[in-house]
Amino acid sequence: MWSIKANGIYHFQLEWATNKQLFEPTNDWQTWRNKLVEALPGIGQAKVSFAIEMIHPTEAECICLDRHMLKAFGWTQLDKQPELDQYMIYEDYWLKLSAERGVPPVISRNIFWDRIQKQDSSLYWAQSIID
């Protein structure tokens, strides 16, 4: 496992140093995310989507479908990510629901996560750095 992560970090550094435009968002967030996943071996859709969420929380039109989100969609193989086409079906559904409610998809996903954690505010995770 460590060799996969080391290889992923190496390729990330290499791409960052030589191909900066790869890391610039495009108008199609999902296509951009998928290109990043292809260019960064060992880093899948969920991890890349999470990084995009952290950098562009109100603009991103892709979301991190981690095991908790997948479980909400009825995914039972929680130790395995779905294939890209299934990932995009779930993601497109979430994007549609968020758009219908006028809430950025990353924000709605974070609200959903807070509910799973039985938290009223997203600040609970930051308590260790606030104190």
Task: Label the model's feature ranges.
Residues 1-12:
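Non-catalytic DNA-binding core/recognition domains of DNA-processing enzymes
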